[in-house]
Amino acid sequence: MNQNKPIWVAGLMSGTSLDGVDAACLYTDGVDILGFGSSAYVPYSAKEREVLRSGLGKWPGDTSLHEVGVVVRDLHMQALQNLPTVDLIGFHGQTLSHDPQNGRTHQLGDGAELARLVGTPVIWDFRSEDVAKGGQGAPLAPIYHWALARYAKLLEPIAIVNLGGVGNLTWVDPRLPAENGLLAFDTGPANAPLNDYMIKKLNKSYDEDGNLAAQGVADLNLVARFMRDGYFARPVPKSIDRGDFSYIGSVVESLSNEDAAATLTAIIVAGILQALEHLPQNPKQMWITGGGRKNTELMRLLRSAMPMRVCDIDEMGFDGDMVEAQAFAYLAARVARGFPTSFAKTTGVATPLSGGRMSIAEVF
């Protein structure tokens, strides 16, 4: 693998929504996007999702994590089998716990084992060093968002919002170098509390098209109460763990299912709207990526609330299902070349840092 020339990289991502494994190929030199390749999605079964949920909040060394690790390994292997041969793999793993205030983060998944199994070098453990050096360890996709804006030849700032289990916002000015043209942070909860509620109350994995929320009325007093959570007063950049807002389910417990779904959806929008106060300037466009963009009611509310054009990133010619997986392909290429993956205004790390470690496939 020539690290100074463009290479094909496969990125693997399993997010906090616990939907499944996204896998995508990217042709890149670690600076520019030079081509998009094949992608694959392997959904988790109900049983696999249950196993993964059992690991949430746990840390390395917990003996109950063996079965969780097997699910992570096997499903990622299955995703890779649906892709062509590549030069490098970027493997995020499954976030189980994230506590940057105490210098800890846990992404389950053994990149060294994956490299042995597939015979390809693997970049993994992207977040630990950033957290160890005082950063938040998240979000990491912003540098890829910068590359996307450059690929689209944008000439003015834009906001890219990923709606996974947690919401993340990246403000990008593509006219500037990444270190100066990025600001990123977590906006608050996104799909996770709503999905958890749907599973608990209705035995459904998510609110399809936002149909349940559309039938309800949001309790704006509860939304305002939630927005007084101390997280929203913290300076940016900042990040959260999926479990930090697990109490939301009990907050809406007294509401009907329809009103609870509407309230949980309104909370997502309120977090993003509040996030705009932190931006250097309001962009004219907001691109939405991640699973939340498929929630018709959520997108309707965002378009109504935001003071700029809001669009599904697919409308711009990108695959919104695969942006996160592509991001970890791009990050892997950057790590291989020693380029920084996080910055002061994305994770809060003091100086630009190239996180992640490489495991080389063993040759016998």
Across the structure, where does each feature detected by a protein language model lie?
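Phosphate-binding/catalytic loop of phosphoryl-transfer enzymes
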Residues: 4-8, 100-105, 120-204
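Conserved ATP-utilizing enzyme core subdomain
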Residues: 6, 20-34, 39-44, 178-269, ...
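Glycine-rich phosphate-binding/hydrolytic loop that grips phosphoryl groups
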Residues: 18, 314-364
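A glycine- and small-aliphatic-rich helix-loop capping segment at beta-alpha/alpha-beta transitions
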Residues: 25-32, 102-113, 146-150, 173-181, ...
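Short beta-strand-loop/turn "lid" adjacent to the catalytic site in phosphate-handling enzymes
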Residues: 59-111
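Phosphate/ATP-binding catalytic cores across multiple sugar-kinase/actin-like superfamilies
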Residues: 75-83, 257-282
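Glycine-rich phosphate-binding loops at beta-strand->alpha-helix junctions
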Residues: 96, 283-303
